[in-house]
Amino acid sequence: MNETEKVNQIVSSLIPNVVQIDEIEYLPGGYNNDNFRVTIKDEIFVVRVVRDPRPRPFEKTYVSLSIAPELIALDTSNGHMITRWIEGNLLTTTTLSPIEGAHYLRDLHNAIPSSITRYDVIEQISHHFDSAGQVGKEQPWLERIRWQEREIRGCHNDLNPWNIISTENGLRTLDWEWAGDNDPLFDVIGFCYGAHYSHAEFFLCAETYLGQRVSEETLRTTQAIFQLREHAWAIAQISAGNNHEGIIEQRDRSIANVEQLL
């Protein structure tokens, strides 16, 4: 089945009354999924075609939030999804100041419900190492980092600039696959890395978000655990055959960052 046939099949299953798709355009950039801009009777949607279909019992809660694109349909048994197209610019092409970033993060977290599901960073890292055939090799890193969660609340956990769109009505957040309760400072750090902030700007964003001082140790260990998560995800993807150049680069860059932080 080619891409066009796959998109048609998903649209037909999720929106049964659709008779004809007028246009299908592939959207580059997805590492885990394939995304398509689809036009149906002058309306524009995004169809997410997942490469690894699996049940997603909690994701619908997050993708239904007003801070996400409007949800049209989601198959929670496999993850295929249709949302309404949003006009705007990804944060890959525009930037927020550290203070603007802190306000975005605060609004984001205030909108995300807690107690839906848990995103345990340590468990995720261990799972990725296991999937890559490197069972237990994360432990020396974890022992050196000694990261401790400060508080737990609903988080996004993947705030790279490709997942945030600046629109005329404010910021909208995409890709809620990994949402769940976690330390919100993990989200802050992930956002700051994506924004390419300087060391001082990391502090400014984190302290503006928290409304209090942040110790060098807290910032450093959270940066390190975030980078180890990025490395762990990359080695798992590569082990599964996803040899995208960007993933290989992430594997090498993130573990080098961990070394530098330690």
PLM regions: where:
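Active-site acidic catalytic loop and adjacent metal/ATP-binding pocket
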Residues: 28, 32-39, 47, 142-188
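Conserved N-terminal boundary motif of the eukaryotic protein kinase catalytic domain
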Residues: 18-26
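A short beta-turn/loop motif at secondary-structure boundaries
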Residues: 26-30, 74-76, 222-223
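A conserved alpha-helical element in kinase catalytic cores
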Residues: 33, 43-108
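An alpha-helical support segment within catalytic cores of ATP-dependent transferases
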Residues: 3-18, 111-157, 161-162, 167, ...
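A glycine-centered beta->alpha junction motif in the catalytic cores
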Residues: 52, 79-94, 110-113, 127-128, ...
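Activation segment
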Residues: 52, 88, 171, 179-181, ...
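Active-site activation/catalytic loop segments of kinase-like enzymes and analogous catalytic loops
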Residues: 185-214, 224-242, 252, 257
